[in-house]
C-alpha cells in the first residue's frame, strides 16, 4: 500500500518535471534569442529590458516563494489543479535558467560563424537558425540535462501547495 502511494507521487513529480521542462525550454529559448539579438546588434531594447527584469526576479527569488505566489496569489480565485499550478511555476522558473544557459551557448559561438552566414547571403534569422543555434545546442546540451535534474529535485517542494499550516 505504501509503495503504491509512493509510485503515484513519483509519477506526479515526473509529470510535473516533464511539462515544466517543456515550458521552460520554450520560454528559455525565446528569452535567450531576444537577449542574444540585443547583445549582438542592439535591437529589441524594450523586450530585452523585460527579459532582464524577468531573469533578475525569477533567478533572485526562492522557488518555494514563487510556487506560493503562483498558487495563493495568481491562481487564488481560480479553481485549477495543483499540478497545473506547479507546472506553471516550475516552468517559469526553469525558463529563466534555460535562457541563460542557451544565451551563453549562443555567445560561445565564434563571431566568424556569424560572418560566415552573412557571407553566404543569410539574414540574421537564417544565420541563427541554420548556423548558430545547431552549434549552440550541442554546446548547451549537458547544462540543459543538469537543469532537468535540478528541476526534478525541486519539484519535491510542490507538495507544499495546499499545506496551509506552513503559510500561517
Per-range role (PLM):
Residues 1-6:
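Single conserved hydrophobic/aromatic residue that forms the stacking wall/gate
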Residues 77, 151-168:
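Glycine-rich helix-loop "coupling/hinge" segments at transmembrane-helix boundaries
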Amino acid at each position: 500500500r505504501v509503495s503504491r502511494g509512493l509510485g503515484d507521487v513519483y509519477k506526479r513529480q515526473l509529470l510535473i518535471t516533464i511539462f515544466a521542462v517543456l515550458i521552460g525550454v520554450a520560454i528559455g529559448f525565446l528569452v535567450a534569442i531576444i537577449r542574444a539579438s540585443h547583445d549582438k546588434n542592439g535591437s529589441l531594447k524594450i523586450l530585452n529590458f523585460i527579459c532582464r527584469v524577468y531573469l533578475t526576479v525569477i533567478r533572485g527569488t526562492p522557488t518555494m516563494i514563487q510556487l506560493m505566489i503562483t498558487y495563493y496569489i495568481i491562481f487564488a480565485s481560480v479553481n485549477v489543479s495543483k499540478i497545473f499550478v506547479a507546472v506553471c511555476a516550475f516552468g517559469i522558473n526553469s525558463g529563466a535558467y534555460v535562457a541563460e544557459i542557451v544565451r551563453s551557448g549562443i555567445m560561445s559561438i565564434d563571431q566568424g560563424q556569424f560572418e560566415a552566414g552573412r557571407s553566404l547571403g543569410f539574414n540574421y534569422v537564417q544565420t541563427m537558425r541554420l548556423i548558430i543555434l545547431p552549434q549552440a545546442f550541442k554546446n548547451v546540451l549537458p547544462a540543459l540535462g543538469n537543469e532537468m535534474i535540478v528541476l526534478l529535485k525541486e519539484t519535491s517542494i510542490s507538495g507544499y501547495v495546499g499545506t496551509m499550516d506552513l503559510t500561517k
